[in-house]
């Protein structure tokens, strides 16, 4: 049969201040095994403590932003500047289309296939592994407790020591998710 070139999946570096990455190095081997060539923008994982060499050791290729933007498919947390994305590209990101209809409209006008990862249904069991909202909400809730705990003048857990017992702090959790 005919040998088909591997689809190139580009991982973009996020804007300043964003510490998450769309794909961690440990996920690269699965993508390569599925037949993708994974291309990572140099420094994409720096703020998440994932070095370029870590991505390379898992099978990704490290290149410049310009080279990543030439990939057939791109993945990022935040929508990149759509003027930089070529026509026909598949862009996967957290587009938040109801708050950012301009991202949807510009994608359509530029011929970009937009897959808004935050719009994948949460209730379908076969789609749960792709549910970015649950994982991010879980991490946000965990971090909220840690940040809140850093402002509490008492110990968080009850502790019984030879010097006595320290009563635990009390919390009120507002909201749900």
Annotate each PLM feature:
Residues 174-177:
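Glycine-rich Rossmann-fold phosphate-binding loop(s) that bind the pyrophosphate
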Residues 5-8, 82-170:
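Glycine/serine-rich phosphate-binding loop and adjoining beta1-alpha1 elements at the start
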Residues 3-110:
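An N-terminal-biased, well-structured beta-alpha scaffold segment characteristic
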């Amino acid at each position: 049969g005919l040998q088909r070139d591997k689809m190139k999946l580009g991982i973009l570096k996020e804007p300043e201040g964003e510490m998450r990455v769309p794909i961690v190095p440990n996920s690269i081997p699965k993508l390569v095994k599925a037949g993708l060539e994974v291309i990572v923008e140099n420094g994409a994982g720096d703020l998440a403590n994932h070095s370029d060499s870590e991505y390379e050791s898992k099978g990704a290729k490290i290149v410049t932003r310009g080279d990543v933007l030439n990939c057939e498919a791109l993945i990022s947390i935040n929508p990149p500047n759509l003027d930089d994305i070529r026509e026909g590209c598949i862009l996967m990101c957290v587009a938040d289309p109801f708050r950012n209809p301009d991202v949807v409209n510009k994608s359509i006008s530029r011929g970009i296939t937009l897959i808004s990862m935050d719009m994948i249904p949460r209730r379908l069991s076969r789609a749960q592994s792709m549910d970015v909202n649950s994982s991010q909400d879980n991490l946000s809730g965990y971090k909220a407790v840690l940040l809140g705990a850093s402002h509490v003048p008492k110990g968080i857990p009850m502790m019984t020591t030879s010097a006595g017992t320290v009563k635990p702090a009390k919390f009120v959790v507002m909201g749900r998710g």
